[in-house]
Amino acid sequence: MNKARKMYLIISIAIGGAIGATSRYIISTAIQNLSSNAFPYGMLACNVLGSLILGMLYDSLAKAGIFTDNIKAFIQIGILGSFTTFSAFSLEAFLMFEKGDHITAIVFILLSVLLSISGLVLGLNVLRLVF
């Protein structure tokens, strides 16, 4: 890959990252504000939703053949990579353990992993049925 193409790829990912991170903040905050509970529902929702969308797009982007590597990177790495929050998830779980909220932390970890993988599988299979 030449320098110009690589730079365009990096810029595509960066723009997608800005979109995904901003979307994550807006959606996560809105969902969290609906709850009086300290459980991180907003982050959980973003991780599951992002996994669902990635599952739906993963096959369709590959099969459609109309998307360039830059568009795939823009969506998958940029938007969805910054929309889902695994590093923030890890910190949130650690802080729960540190506060002594062991049960809440374990429930959060299990739900995050199981529902995110389920969302990915569901998204993949829904679009496989359609296309």
What are these model-derived regions, one by one?
Residues 1-131:
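Membrane-interface helix-loop junctions in multi-pass transporters/channels
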